[in-house]
Every structure is written in structure tokens, then in C-alpha cells.
Amino acid sequence: MSTLFVSDVHLSEKNPKLTDLFFYFLKNKAILSRSLYILGDLFETWVGDDNITYISKELANITNYLADNGTSCYFIKGNRDFLIGKSYFKSSKITLLPYKKIININKQSIIILHGDTLCLNDKNYQKFKKLVNQDWLQKFFLKLPLCARIKISNLIINKRKKLNLKRMNYLTKINKEYIKKIMEQTNTNIMIHGHIHMPKVHVLPNRKYRIVLGMWNKSGSILEINKKLSLIKFSKLYCSYTSYPLKY
């Protein structure tokens, strides 16, 4: 059985076709796998576990079904859904992982993360991330009325879209020396991350790989690991594979 990885799905009530595609993937592809790792930004935004929507309810129903039928689901928080709380993970039978996690698959030592922490060139974002991850600020925000949290979230989303149009090239400049340092310190030979929306398998020296997951839109972006690495462009009608052999 294979292990699957996705990130940057950005589920939103405003994009029902995307939601339908992701749920189709869970029911028809993920159900056949051993494990599914979701590496952040599953949701376009998350303002609290009390904001119950069709998407959050149906996703929990599906992941419960997966867990009950042998597919384990794991989650690393991204920069859009870092406020998902314990109650939702419990109700959905999804296991929360730390921001960086080392796993082993087929004798491969792999480090997984969302990927925003690799964008060291974006100093303003790193300051923002440090601020919003403070426990006191998150508790304060979650105590606000739900309508206020939704309004604040929408303002942030609109501002983020404008900033990203101007700064996308700058934001996607991953610090390669930092990546090398992380992989050496953790003694891993594969790194998997999302965030920058540029799917690719980067072949590194010494039989190492850095795999970037893509963003979901009209099609899905999936990494599958079994006896090889495969980046999959997924839709209901077709799947295209770009595969690389695993080196032992």
C-alpha cells in the first residue's frame, strides 16, 4: 500500500468544485492508501472549531470513514489553518503532528513540514508568523464573537491576495542552505513540503530529494510513495504521473 501527501488544498465555501474534487480524492484514492499526510493549508481559513460548516462536517465524516477502514490521516498546520483545535482533530480522527516531523517509509528517512518556515527571505512574514503563534493572542482571538473573527479573517485574506500578487517571486525563494542544514541535522534524505505552490521533485546530491507539493485548483496535486516517488496531477477524469525511483 502507498502513502499519500497533499497540501494547499484551500477548501472554501466559495469553491464548491474544488471541495467536490478533494472529497472525491479522499473517497476514491486515499481510501486505498496506508496513510494520508496533509501538510497544511487544507482550509482557506479557520477561525475556530465552533465555526461549523458543510465542509468541516463532511470532511470529518470522510476522515472518520478512512480511519475506520485502515487509512490513517495526519496533519501539519499551515499558515491559514493554524487555529484548528483539539476538538476538531478528535472529531475527525485526524492526528495532529508538530510543525516538523520525521517519518520513515520503505527505509527512507523523511522530514515533512508545511514549508513557510523555509521562506527566510520574507522577513515580514516570519515576524507575522511569530506574532500569531503566540498562545495569548490566539486565545484572545478565539474569544471574540464568531462574526468578528470571520470579518477579520476576510480582511486578512483580501490583503494577503494583494500582497502575494506583488511579492510572489520574492516569497518563493526558498533558502537552499537552510534546507541543507535541516536535512543534515535531522539525518534525513527526503524533504516534503508545500506552501510555495510550485510542484516539483528536486534531485539533490548524495541521493537526496526535496519534493514540493502543488496547490489544488482545477486539478489536485498529490505525492505518492511506494517503491518510487510519484507526483500526481489528479482529476476525476485522469491522473498523470511523474515518477522517480527510490535509491537505497
Curated annotation (Swiss-Prot):
SUPFAM superfamilies: Metallo-dependent phosphatases
Matches recorded under CDD domains: MPP_YbbF-LpxH
Catalysed conversion reaction: UDP-2-N,3-O-bis[(3R)-3-hydroxytetradecanoyl]-alpha-D-glucosamine + H2O = 2-N,3-O-bis[(3R)-3-hydroxytetradecanoyl]-alpha-D-glucosaminyl 1-phosphate + UMP + 2 H(+)
Predominant localisation class: membrane
Cofactor note: Binds 2 Mn(2+) ions per subunit in a binuclear metal center.
NCBIfam families: lipid_A_lpxH, PRK05340.1
Record-stated family: Belongs to the LpxH family.
Gene Ontology MF terms in the entry: manganese ion binding; UDP-2,3-diacylglucosamine hydrolase activity
Co-factor requirement: Mn(2+)
Name of the protein in its database record: UDP-2,3-diacylglucosamine hydrolase
Residues engaged in binding Mn(2+) 1: D8, H10, D41, H197
Topology of this chain in the membrane: Peripheral membrane protein
InterPro entries (alphabetical): Calcineurin-like_PHP_ApaH, LpxH-like, Metallo-depent_PP-like, UDP-diacylglucosamine_Hdrlase
Disulphide bridges, residue numbers: none
Function: Hydrolyzes the pyrophosphate bond of UDP-2,3-diacylglucosamine to yield 2,3-diacylglucosamine 1-phosphate (lipid X) and UMP by catalyzing the attack of water at the alpha-P atom. Involved in the biosynthesis of lipid A, a phosphorylated glycolipid that anchors the lipopolysaccharide to the outer membrane of the cell.
Keywords: Cell inner membrane, Cell membrane, Hydrolase, Lipid A biosynthesis, Lipid biosynthesis, Lipid metabolism, Manganese, Membrane, Metal-binding
GO CC annotation: cytoplasm; extrinsic component of plasma membrane
Cited PANTHER family: UDP-2,3-DIACYLGLUCOSAMINE HYDROLASE, UDP-2,3-DIACYLGLUCOSAMINE HYDROLASE-RELATED
Binding residues annotated for substrate, in chain numbering: N79, R80, D122, N164, R167, H195
Cellular localization per UniProt: Cell inner membrane
Gene name of this polypeptide: lpxH
GO terms of biological process kind: lipid A biosynthetic process
EC number from the UniProt entry: 3.6.1.54
Annotated metabolic or biological route of this protein: Glycolipid biosynthesis; lipid IV(A) biosynthesis; lipid IV(A) from (3R)-3-hydroxytetradecanoyl-[acyl-carrier-protein] and UDP-N-acetyl-alpha-D-glucosamine: step 4/6
Keyword check for Nucleus: no
Binding-site list for Mn(2+) 2: D41, N79, H114, H195
